Amino acid sequence: MKKDDPIYKRRIADDFNEGKELLQNLENNITMFGSARTAQSDKHAILAQKLAYNLAQRGINIISGGGKGIMEAANRGAYKSNNAESIGLSIKLPFEDSSNPYTTKSLMFNYFFSRKYMLVKYSRACIVFPGGFGTLDEMFEVLTLTQTGKMAGGFKVYLVGVEYWKYLVKFIKKSLYPTGMINKEDIDLITLTDDIALIEKDISALLNKDFIEEEIDKLIK
């Protein structure tokens, strides 16, 4: 389909407009990324489900790509909690069922780029579990947006799966940073940990800080 095709333009507009309508009035959202290929019995899927459940119990909405694997685990955890929204932003793919049934709100996107934007537009943090090219694409776009000040202040990026991610983090620290491709502050954007209690504590503190600042702003106004 050509980019000047009116159908193409309409579908792009639909993606953004429907995404905004679905998410703009929701607060306390975090996004979870990870492979669609991960089995639900895998340790990382189990961890993702537990973390999503615990965060949802605190009233924190969980956003995922709405697919299988880690995405399903994240939605499943939030859905089981029944204390927050379990949001799935999936993509139309040929010959493949790309959605999971554990969502309270969902949207099917036409294009990857609009879906990727909406996955984090209304989020305050992202938690990245092991994944392939798609997960890496999502993670590095978020890091780039955070690095360049396009995300909300204090946006957090967590990598869960120390053994899986450690060589990537080493590359960032030992190759990108020493050659001047990134700054020291850019390294600090990433938290590598398997401690989900730490993530829960950090995110809760961040969202509580947001709430306090919003209340102060209301008083000043």
Protein language model regions, located:
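Solvent-exposed alpha-helices and their adjacent loops that cap or buttress functional pockets
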Residues: 22-25, 79-81, 98-101, 118-121, ...
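C-terminal functional extensions of proteins
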Residues: 159-162, 166-221
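Glycine-rich beta-alpha loop segments
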Residues: 1-89
